[in-house]
């Protein structure tokens, strides 16, 4: 297996392989995801494959946290050993995660709340657009603005820590059940989104938590299986092991977490699965080596809920906070004990764990608390959270929580208008034949599909549902809607304004099985709008890439009788679109999960009040079988460690894979149409230093790693012109092709810059891109360093990964 050599050289893995996984084999199904692990797959056990990096580095306050660090150290100096154990161990309480108060020191505790698109356990809070939706804007300002607004709501409800944003999963597989919580199947775009979102959260005063670190790319077997007749630590089958080589982990999966560290993220959540054999929450190579040493991370590492599988090993491995604190599946049985808790005091007293390590754990927890001023006038926890918290209801509380804050306070402000605008800006126009869109006060429209109307399952999406529009996915990353504007509601309101006849049919089975001409009266409508949806949730991966609820058949039925069929998808991510070339399907719009203003956002696009400018954050293939790297869905052996996911595709995910193998696609990464047209011209480059070395200067590590990697080394500029007749926005995208001297396996091109610009008809604007050293570097597994290869780079700028009209060459490093 090719990847094993890189793992061995890097020190990420110390083992020899017999055989890895070949995703091209007969174990893969084309119509539903299925990858059955071959019997001769190399099995990595929990120990001996990922080298120890000990001790866990102490926080230094680097990056401007020195004053807060001093306050944290002073706080820790006043704690008893029992209080120190409390500070690193979660307790059931009013929030999803809770650190108890220490009244004698004036510390009111910490409240940690889900999630990446809303405060899940709260009333009178907004449901924002999902991560994949926000990424589809390709708008750095919107990403920041969304972060600020969400941070304001978390703080308003008394939550100290917002459990988001998400860079893991990155999107290795289109089947990933939680891809919608993250941003894009590209490390650069995800990195920018992470950085801007974190800055927004923390500028609003709430701690951000970057998750899930690292290699958490599938839901199937993400957790171990426990013996139902055994103890709460009696595991009969371990979680899957993500086996990733050194270069791949640096250039793909670690990349956006470097942006998070640079943004001074307060905390990082380690993931459920194993990494190269060892559980991610006790893997010292990953937590101590990559995160705390290489990236200079100054905050604290918290476990995913129930992701702690040891005490001393996890503490030494770099875990600082055990959430939610108990044993068993998802850590929900604190009454039975904890890997931390009293075991921390025992380990310190018997000399197994040095007290200095425990002190650093708490210093890391408290430093961002002081840095963000959460010790000064921070809002009290909203008591309604306790009433809504089904994860740890009051009956499970072991400690007392003094909830004196105002109940059910409304923190939404004017965020509804912001969510509406963000949803529209994220909407992607994939097809628009014969100027089907925008609609211009049509005389009649027909609305089809079970995604158009009101939900029938209530305000929280706990599981998939047949009837009702889909505006958020499921699991801990969902939200509780205080209201939801549906597409049908918004279309009827617009129809009333325009005196349009609006008819609707929401039963997909009826539509698919009927002659739709018998449904509408009296004549065919001017436009037929078909709303389709695709559910995804935490805890399970998608079974298909097609739309749900016979959506393809619904489109076929409508398009067979209506020559102006417009399809809108509300999806978690990638969909097969077999109807894309149907002559009667005149327009296709991808809206993803837009949040509570879903209907208003899509009507703004359909009627041209907002010109679509969203771009795909992934590739839509012609066929589902064209994708590589499906999740491992089954094993044929029964060993405790047998579940493995070998990332043999290495750097070839999404567009990198399609480019490397010259596979034609339906809609490429970065693609998206507009109601106007744009052109590019006059590409220019300018070096920012007289001499650029291959090896970066070795500077003292700061949050984000070696500061030299973040230094700009080249400027690239290009002129963008709106050549159409309406105002619109577009996203020039810069891709880099490395010289031939770069190591084998380097992708044909990689995104390294983008900017969204809005232009009036005929207006031109010069857009500049700053290329940092890291943008032109690869990770060298021998020297363990980022290197700029010698030779000529190709710089291309265009409007998608396969529409790159502007090209130039640069040679940063010569022999």
From Swiss-Prot:
Location(s), subcellular: Secreted
Catalytic residue positions: 304
Gene Ontology MF term list: beta-glucosidase activity
Keyword Membrane tagged: no
GO biological process annotation, one example: carbohydrate metabolic process
Coiled coil: none
Reaction(s) catalysed (UniProt annotation): Hydrolysis of terminal, non-reducing beta-D-glucosyl residues with release of beta-D-glucose
Function (record text): Beta-glucosidases are one of a number of cellulolytic enzymes involved in the degradation of cellulosic biomass. Catalyzes the last step releasing glucose from the inhibitory cellobiose.
Primary localisation category: secreted
Enzyme class: hydrolase
Gene Ontology CC terms, in alphabetical order: extracellular space
This protein's record includes keyword Lipid metabolism: no
One Pfam family linked to the record: Fn3-like
Entry keyword set: Carbohydrate metabolism, Cellulose degradation, Glycoprotein, Glycosidase, Hydrolase, Polysaccharide degradation, Secreted, Signal
Residues bearing attached sugar chains per UniProt: 40, 58, 229, 276, 343, 350, 402, 507, 563, 584, 623, 662, 715
EC number annotated for this UniProt entry: 3.2.1.21
InterPro entries for the chain: Cellulose_deg_GH3, Fn3-like, Glyco_hydro_3_C, Glyco_hydro_3_C_sf, Glyco_hydro_3_N, Glyco_hydro_3_N_sf, Glycoside_hydrolase_SF, Ig-like_fold
Pathway it works in: Glycan metabolism; cellulose degradation
Entry's family note: Belongs to the glycosyl hydrolase 3 family.
Name of the protein described by the UniProt record: Probable beta-glucosidase G
Top-level taxon of origin: Eukaryota
Signal peptide: 1-20
């Amino acid at each position: 297996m090719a990847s094993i050599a890189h793992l061995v050289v890097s020190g990420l893995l110390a083992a020899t392989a017999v055989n890895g996984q070949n995703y091209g084999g007969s174990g893969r199904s084309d119509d539903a995801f299925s990858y059955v692990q071959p019997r001769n797959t190399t099995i990595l056990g929990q120990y001996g494959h990922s080298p120890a990096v000990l001790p866990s580095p102490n926080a230094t306050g680097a990056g401007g946290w020195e004053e807060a660090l001093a306050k944290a150290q002073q706080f820790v100096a006043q704690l008893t050993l029992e209080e120190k154990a409390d500070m690193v161990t979660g307790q059931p309480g009013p929030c999803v995660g809770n650190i108890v108060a220490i009244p004698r020191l004036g510390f009111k505790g910490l409240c940690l709340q889900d999630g990446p698109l809303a405060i899940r356990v709260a009333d009178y809070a907004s449901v924002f657009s999902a991560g994949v939706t926000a990424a589809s804007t390709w708008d750095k300002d919107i990403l920041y603005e969304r972060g600020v607004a969400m941070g304001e709501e978390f703080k308003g409800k008394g939550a100290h820590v917002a459990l988001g944003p998400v860079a893991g999963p990155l999107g290795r597989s289109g089947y990933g059940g939680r891809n919608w919580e993250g941003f894009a199947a590209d490390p650069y775009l995800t990195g920018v989104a992470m950085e801007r979102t974190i800055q927004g959260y923390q500028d609003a005063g709430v701690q951000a938590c970057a998750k899930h670190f690292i290699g958490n790319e599938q839901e199937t077997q993400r957790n171990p299986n426990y013996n139902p007749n055994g103890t709460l630590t009696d595991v009969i089958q371990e979680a899957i092991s993500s086996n990733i080589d050194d270069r791949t982990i640096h250039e793909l999966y670690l990349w956006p977490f470097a942006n998070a560290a640079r943004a001074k993220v307060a905390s990082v959540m380690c993931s459920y699965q194993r990494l190269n054999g060892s559980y991610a929450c006790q893997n010292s190579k990953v937590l101590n080596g990559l995160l705390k040493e290489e990236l200079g991370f100054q905050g604290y590492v918290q476990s995913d809920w129930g992701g702690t599988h040891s005490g001393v090993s996890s503490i030494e491995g770099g875990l600082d906070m055990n959430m939610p604190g108990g044993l068993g599946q998802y850590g929900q049985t604190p009454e039975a004990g904890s890997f931390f808790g009293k075991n921390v005091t025992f380990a310190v007293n018997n000399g197994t764990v040095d007290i200095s390590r425990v002190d650093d754990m708490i210093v890391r927890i408290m430093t961002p608390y002081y840095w963000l001023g959460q010790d000064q006038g921070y809002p009290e926890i909203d008591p309604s959270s306790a009433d809504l918290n089904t994860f740890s209801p009051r009956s499970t509380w072991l400690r007392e929580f003094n909830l004196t804050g105002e109940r059910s306070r409304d923190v939404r402000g004017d965020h509804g208008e912001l969510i509406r605008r963000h949803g529209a800006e994220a909407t992607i126009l994939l097809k628009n034949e014969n100027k089907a869109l925008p609609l211009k006060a049509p005389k009649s429209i027909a609305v089809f599909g079970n995604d158009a109307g009101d939900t029938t399952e209530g305000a929280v999406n706990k599981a998939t549902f047949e009837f009702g529009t889909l505006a958020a996915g499921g699991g801990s990353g969902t939200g509780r809607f205080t209201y939801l504007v549906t597409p049908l509601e918004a279309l009827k309101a617009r129809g009333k304004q325009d005196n349009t006849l609006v008819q609707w049919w929401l039963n997909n089975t009826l539509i698919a099985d009927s002659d739709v001409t018998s449904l509408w009266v009296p004549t065919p409508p001017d436009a037929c709008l078909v709303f389709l949806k695709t559910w995804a949730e935490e805890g399970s991966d998608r079974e298909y890439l097609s739309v749900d609820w016979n959506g393809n058949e619904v489109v076929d039925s409508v398009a067979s009788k209506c020559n102006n069929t417009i399809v809108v998808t509300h999806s978690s991510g990638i969909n097969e679109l077999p109807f894309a070339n149907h002559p009667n399907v005149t327009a296709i719009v991808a809206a993803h999960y837009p949040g509570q203003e879903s209907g208003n956002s899509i009507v703004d696009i359909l009627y041209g009040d907002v010109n679509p400018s969203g771009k795909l954050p992934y590739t839509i293939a012609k066929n589902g079988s064209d994708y590589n790297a499906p999740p491992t869905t089954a094993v044929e052996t029964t060993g405790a460690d047998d579940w493995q996911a070998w990332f043999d595709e290495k750097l070839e995910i999404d567009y990198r894979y399609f480019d490397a193998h010259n596979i034609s696609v339906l809609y490429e990464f970065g693609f998206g149409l507009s109601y106007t047209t744009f052109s590019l011209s006059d590409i220019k480059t300018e070096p920012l230093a007289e001499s650029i070395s291959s090896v970066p200067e070795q500077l003292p590590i700061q949050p984000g790693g070696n500061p030299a990697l973040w230094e700009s080394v080249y400027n690239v500029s290009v002129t963008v012109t709106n050549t159409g007749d309406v105002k619109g926005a577009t996203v020039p995208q810069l891709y880099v092709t490395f010289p031939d001297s770069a190591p084998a396996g380097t992708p044909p091109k990689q995104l390294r810059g983008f900017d969204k610009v809005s232009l009036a008809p005929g207006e031109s604007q010069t857009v500049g891109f700053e290329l940092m050293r890291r943008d032109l570097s690869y990770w060298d597994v021998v020297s363990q360093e980022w290197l700029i290869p010698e030779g000529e780079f190709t710089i291309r700028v265009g409007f998608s990964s396969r529409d790159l009209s502007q090209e130039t060459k640069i040679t940063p490093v010569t022999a």
